[in-house]
Amino acid sequence: MIIGTKQEFENLADYVLRDYLGSEYESYSPFNVTAFAEEYLKLEISFFDFNPEENIEGMRIGNKIILDRRLCDPIRVGERNFTVAHECGHEIINWQDPTYVPYQITNYRFKNQHKELKTEDDFKEWQANVVASCLLLRPNLVMWSMDKFLKADKLTVFGDCRFYALDLYYFKMMARYLGVSQTCLFYRLSRLGLLDHQPDSAYDPRKDVLYR
C-alpha cells in the first residue's frame, strides 16, 4: 500500500493532469475523464447490467473498467464520471508501487459506499477518492466556474449545508457544467478554501430569493 498525506495525493493528481493536458490544463473545459482513462492510462471502459440489489456502480478487472449500465442515464453523469475517476485514481496511485501488476487487479465500487477509515482497503478507497476529485476539478477550472456561475469568490454555507436558494441554483448549474455530482463539487470547494462557512443563525430569510 502506498502511504501519503491528502496533500501529497492531490499533488500527484495535479502532476499527472499537467502531463496529460499540457497547455490545456489552463483551459476552462470540463475534464473528459473517459478519454483520460482510455488514452493516458490505457484502461478499457464498458458497461454491464449489474443486479440493482447489489448496488454495484462498477468493477475493475485488469485494465478493464466495467460500469453499471444505469450510469449511462444523462442525469447520472456525475456518478459515472466519478466512478471512472475513482478507478483512474487507483491506477495512478498503484503506478507508484514497483510491485504493481495491473492484470492481477479485481475490485468493486458500490453505490454510497461510506466507511470509516479502519482497514487498508478503506484507506485505498479514500486515496482514490482524493485523486478522483482532483482529476475532475482542477483549481483554475473551479475558480473560473465560481466566477462564471456564482459571480463570487466563495460560496456561502450556513450550518452544515444550507444555501440561499439562488446560490443553490447556480451551484447545481455549476456541477452540471463540470460533469460532477454536487457532493463531489462541495468537497472540492471545501478543499480549495472556496466555502464561506457561517452559523445557521446568520441565515436571513429576507435575502433568500430566487432572483436578484
What are these regions (language model features)?
Residues M1-R212:
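Active-site hotspot residues in diverse enzymes, especially metal/ion-binding acidic/histidine motifs
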